[in-house]
Every structure is written in C-alpha cells, then in structure tokens.
C-alpha cells in the first residue's frame, strides 16, 4: 500500500512541491527568499482582509476609517502597521530574490524568470494602489502624479487618464476602484506565484555553482523545509521589531494629514521601494521619455536571458561580472537616495548619471564582461 501523501490527488501535488521535491544539496541562504515572499504574501492577504472589514473607500470617510482602525478596533493599530510595513518587507525580499536570480544566473530558466517579472509588475501595481487608500496628502498627490503620467501616451493619453480617474480628477470613483483592484490583485499574485513555482519545478532549482546538480539531489523535507522555517523566524523577528518599535520609519509624515486637493506637499515622492524607478523617471526632461524609461527600468530584466554571453551560468567564478553586479547594486542605492531628494542641482545630474549607468551596466557592460571572461578562460 502506498503512503497517502503519494496517492491522494491533492496531497500528491503538495508532496511533489514541498516534501519529496529533489533539491540541489548546496543551495545557500539566498534561496530562502522565495519561501519568505510566500510568507509575506500570506501576512499581507491576512492583515489586508481584516483591514478591509473596517475600511471605507469613500473620500469623506477613508482617512477617518483608518484612524478608527488604529484607535477603536481591537489591535487595529497592530494590523494596520503590520500591513503597511509588510509591504516594505515584501519589497526587501523581492529585491533580494531578483538580485539572487541575476547573480547566480537563475534568469536562464526563461519561463520562471518572465513570470517573475509579471509578478513584480503586479506587486508594484498593488502596492501603489494600496498607498492611495489611507487618503492622506501623499496618497492623493502620489495618485495624481503617477496616474497623470499616462497622459504622455500619444493621442489617447488625456482620455486614458480621465477613464482611469473616473472623472476629471482623482476623486471618489478613483478611490473606490483602487480599493477594488487592491483587494483582488493579491489573489491574482498568489495564483501567478503558483504558476511561477510550477515552471520552477519543471527544471528544478539552480544552485550557487550554476552547474547541473542531478547527480547530487536531496529531498526538500526535512532539509530545506527546516531551513525555510529558520529563515521565516528570522524574517518575523526583524518584521516585528520594525512593526512594534519603529512602525513609522518607512512612512511619510505628510500622509498623517488628510488629502487636500488645494494644498500640494513640498516634495511629492512615492514609498522608498519605488524611489529608484522614480529617480529614473525624473532624470529625463521629456514626459513621454521619462515614462518609457520608467517602464524600461523594470522591463530591462526580461533582456537578461538574451544578453547572457558567458559560458558560465553563475557569477561565482567571474570576477569582472561580480564587480559590475555590485556596481549595479550601489547604483540602485544612489538612485533610491536621489528619488527622495528635491529636483535641484547637484541631485539632477547625479540622478541622470546614475540612470545612464543603470542601463549601461545591464545592456552593455554585462555582455562585454561575459565575452572577456570567456577569453580569459582560454588564455
């Protein structure tokens, strides 16, 4: 008689994905971020569900309802801050996860990588719409500025913006639809994450050496299930430290003021996790050019598999590419810093140089470094 987990139709699927899954024996802590993203998504959906029970998506009462959640609902303050900081945590894990994929050449699993890029777009859209819901000053003006970018689309731009707004400005209709989309998108993300996992399990995981590991596989459980559990506990410790001791450290003080269409905040800026893309957007003086650069700053990830010129998969033994990778990471930190600064010298030129460097490293320097390293191997 076979074990139930190997014969039952539903348990069989779980078994193949999380128990008897053959995994490389040498994958490091950088491979923990996939499961940590799953934990983040579960936290966000759970806390979001409870918040939605008390939130009202009306311009007159949205700000008050968030205040009511924090003041009058049992542990409402905790749920609200868990949800707000959970978004930051989600993006921290997401950027580590993408960085791991670039460093170890995981992007060569093209289907998994491309679905990951779609997931990134979905998560960014969800986070943006969620930031609008508390209806504070930065919520309102952030929504106005970002949705206004669509007016740069030739010919249909102005109509497109009014269609998304549901009127002639960001108002009640906009808030209602953003709430509806913000509620449904995480479930679409969860479904897409399953497809992401499905394609990953078609090929099996990559490993730090970037070489086939078929000769040396170990079962996912107990080895990596316990490793992921340890990672999740470390993540939760960090997460709860932020939520309980520094709940507002990643927020904007302007968002504690109710939305006022007649009063513009001195510096309109998105949450920290969008600042790098915002800096790239602002570094181009032309509106349409800026919007294209903004979209390309994420879409450029899809070119990684096409621009892979090295005969090795991982950067483990490629010192020139390693230097470029860490230069790219440093450049993203600079872009994040610039995105939060006002548009004035010397920040303008620094942002423009950092934007040029960002695209140059990915589109030009990485492929050239790969070819040079191939030559060095034969030398």
Swiss-Prot record:
Keywords, sorted A to Z: Electron transport, Heme, Iron, Membrane, Metal-binding, Mitochondrion, Mitochondrion inner membrane, Respiratory chain, Transmembrane, Transmembrane helix, Transport, Ubiquinone
GO biological process, one term: mitochondrial electron transport, ubiquinol to cytochrome c
Binding sites annotated in the UniProt record for a ubiquinone: 201
GO molecular function ontology, one term from the record: ubiquinol-cytochrome-c reductase activity
GO cellular component assignments: mitochondrial inner membrane; respiratory chain complex III
Residues given in the record as heme b b566 binding sites: 97, 196
Transmembrane segment boundaries: 33-53, 77-98, 113-133, 178-198, 226-246, 288-308, 320-340, 347-367
Record-linked InterPro entries: Cyt_b/b6_C, Cyt_b/b6_C_sf, Cyt_b/b6_N, Cytb/b6-like_sf, Cytochrome_b, Cytochrome_b_C_euk/bac, Cytochrome_b_N_euk/bac, Di-haem_cyt_TM
Localization annotation: Mitochondrion inner membrane
Its membrane topology: Multi-pass membrane protein
Pfam families: Cytochrom_B_C, Cytochrome_B
Co-factor remark: Binds 2 heme b groups non-covalently.
Membrane as UniProt keyword: yes
UniProt cofactor(s): heme b
Additional note from the record: Heme 1 (or BL or b562) is low-potential and absorbs at about 562 nm, and heme 2 (or BH or b566) is high-potential and absorbs at about 566 nm.
Subunit structure: The cytochrome bc1 complex contains 11 subunits: 3 respiratory subunits (MT-CYB, CYC1 and UQCRFS1), 2 core proteins (UQCRC1 and UQCRC2) and 6 low-molecular weight proteins (UQCRH/QCR6, UQCRB/QCR7, UQCRQ/QCR8, UQCR10/QCR9, UQCR11/QCR10 and a cleavage product of UQCRFS1). This cytochrome bc1 complex then forms a dimer.
Protein name: Cytochrome b
Organism from which the protein derives: Perognathus fasciatus (Olive-backed pocket mouse)
Gene: MT-CYB
């Amino acid at each position: 008689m076979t074990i139930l987990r190997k014969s039952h139709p539903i348990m069989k699927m779980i078994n193949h994905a999380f128990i008897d899954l053959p995994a490389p024996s040498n994958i490091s802590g950088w491979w923990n971020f996939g499961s940590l993203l799953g934990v983040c998504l579960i936290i966000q959906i759970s806390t979001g569900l409870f918040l939605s029970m008390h939130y009202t998506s009306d311009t007159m009462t949205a700000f008050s309802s968030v205040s009511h959640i924090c003041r009058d609902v049992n542990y409402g303050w905790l749920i609200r801050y868990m949800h707000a900081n959970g978004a930051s945590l989600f993006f921290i894990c997401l950027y580590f996860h993408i960085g791991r994929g670039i460093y170890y050449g995981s992007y060569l699993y093209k289907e998994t990588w491309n679905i990951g890029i779609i997931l990134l777009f979905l998560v960014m859209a969800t986070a943006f719409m969620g930031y609008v819901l508390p209806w504070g000053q930065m919520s309102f003006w952030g929504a106005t500025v970002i949705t206004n970018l669509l007016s740069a689309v030739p010919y249909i731009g102005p109509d497109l913006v009014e269609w998304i707004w549901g009127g002639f400005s960001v108002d009640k209709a906009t808030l209602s639809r953003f709430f509806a989309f913000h509620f449904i998108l995480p479930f679409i993300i969860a479904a897409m994450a399953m497809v992401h996992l499905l394609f990953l399990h078609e090929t099996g995981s990559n490993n730090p050496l970037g070489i086939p590991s078929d000769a040396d596989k170990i079962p996912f459980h107990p080895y990596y299930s316990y490793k992921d559990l340890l990672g999740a506990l470390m993540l939760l410790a960090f997460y709860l430290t932020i939520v309980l001791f520094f709940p507002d450290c990643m927020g904007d003080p302007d968002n504690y003021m109710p939305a006022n269409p007649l009063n513009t905040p001195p510096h309109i800026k998105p949450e920290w996790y969008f600042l790098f893309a915002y800096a790239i957007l602002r570094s181009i003086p032309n509106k349409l050019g800026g919007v294209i650069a903004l979209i390309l700053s994420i879409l450029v990830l899809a070119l990684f598999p096409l621009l892979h010129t090295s005969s090795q998969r991982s950067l483990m033994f490629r010192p020139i590419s390693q230097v470029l990778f860490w230069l790219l990471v440093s450049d993203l930190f600079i872009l994040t810093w610039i995105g939060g600064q006002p548009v004035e010298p010397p920040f303008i030129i620094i942002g423009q140089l950092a934007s040029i460097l960002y695209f140059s490293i990915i589109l030009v320097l990485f492929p050239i470094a790969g070819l040079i390293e191939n030559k060095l191997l034969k030398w």
